[in-house]
Amino acid sequence: MSIFFHEQLYRTNAVMTKLKNYPVTICGAGALGANIAENLARSGFDKLTVIDRDRIEERNLSTQPYYRSDVGAFKAKILANNLYRAIGTKVDAKTKELTPANTTQLLKDSQLIVDVFDNSVARQAVKDYAEKLSVPCLHAGLSADYAEVIWNDVYRVPSEVNDDVCDYPLARNLVMLTVAVACEAIVSFIATAEQRNFSITQKDLTVQSLFL
């Protein structure tokens, strides 16, 4: 029996084949990126790349799928190791900082980019690359009790004043809500080519479609 037996019953064989063979690059392996990577891998995606230069800190453990024994190690490497041990998925882990100078090198094989970086410079570099090469790109971000999941053509990069994301309030439930919405938007796009934008608000548990 397949590891993805239940997902396959829900999605159909045709969709599962698409998911397995669709190259996806996730930019960031923090609260959103690591959980999105795990969710996609456990949903049947088999061609994942994760880019993140950061190392695991103790404060990451409540919102990111890492262990105390992982503190100090590269997020992308540990994520790749954990997913291979769990379900045999081989994730291409790149422990590099993405900059405007190396976007082509790091993103060149992507058919879909998921941007969950925590700084505006990297987000802008991803957005510009996706626009220039017409690569589908989904951006997801959080602020207080609000989150957005938005495709590149209508996405606006936030100002640098909000870049110090390590110190802002962050609820795990909002992270996981956003992860679920982002992953469903990704699966829906691959299955149907439809690009759907969403907002998520934790206090009133609302997920709304955005028509931008």
PLM ranges: what are they?
Residues 37, 41:
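Gly/Ala-rich phosphate-binding loop of Rossmann-like dinucleotide-binding domains
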Residues 26-29, 50:
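Hydrophobic Val/Ile/Leu positions in short beta-strands of Rossmann-like dinucleotide-binding domains
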